Amino acid sequence: MPEVAVLRIGHRPERDQRVTTHVGLAARALGARGMYLAADDPGVALSITDVASRWGGDFFIENDVKWRRCIQDWKAAGGKVAHLTMYGLRMTDVIDDIRTEERVLVVVGAEKVPGDIYGLADYNVSVTTQPHSEISSLALFLDHLFEGKELNREYPDAKIRIEPTKVGKKTVER
């Protein structure tokens, strides 16, 4: 399976904090190694880092990256770029090819995505051809990419973990 990171572009600090935080949390929970945030919003970065420190894993977040440079650096290091959009090739048609890559940077937009992204991406991936959220696109993409294996991942360094129960809620704290 590839090493995966997410590049969040178009984040508007005055408007998108909750959604961008959820992009990072979904990325972490569903198998990505980290997130690059193409905006300066240390509050979002802190929220995601706080969750990762309590719930385990080595998820990273880099705040205020330049999106074009991030893509160029990723590709220069041999990685591939998958841009999630309504307008790309159907995810079900390309996911097997993407799964064979060693490193994948998943680009998730907020507001209108710069047109250059389509040309810079190795894969423009349509997670349905209908409008829906970037969070659902990312979640579906990662689940298909990792074939559901991320759903039962456990983090040995977690300070908090959920113990599955038929009824009620049970957490274990270390």
Curated annotation (Swiss-Prot):
List residues binding S-adenosyl-L-methionine: 84, 109-113
Family assignment from sequence similarity: Belongs to the aTrm56 family.
This entry's Gene Ontology molecular function terms read: tRNA (cytidine(56)-2'-O)-methyltransferase activity
Q: What does this protein do?
A: Specifically catalyzes the AdoMet-dependent 2'-O-ribose methylation of cytidine at position 56 in tRNAs.
- Principal localization reads cytoplasm
What is the protein name for this chain?
tRNA (cytidine(56)-2'-O)-methyltransferase
Query: Where is this protein found?
Result: Cytoplasm
What are the recorded Gene Ontology BP terms?
tRNA nucleoside ribose methylation
Question: Could you tell me the keywords of this UniProt record?
Answer: Cytoplasm, Methyltransferase, S-adenosyl-L-methionine, Transferase, tRNA processing
Catalytic activity line of the entry? cytidine(56) in tRNA + S-adenosyl-L-methionine = 2'-O-methylcytidine(56) in tRNA + S-adenosyl-L-homocysteine + H(+)
Q: How does it assemble?
A: Homodimer.
Q: Does the keyword Transferase apply?
A: yes
- A GO cellular component annotation in the UniProt record: cytoplasm
Provide the E.C. number(s) assigned to this enzyme: 2.1.1.206
Highest taxon, organism lineage: Archaea
- CDD domains named in the record: aTrm56-like (cd18083)
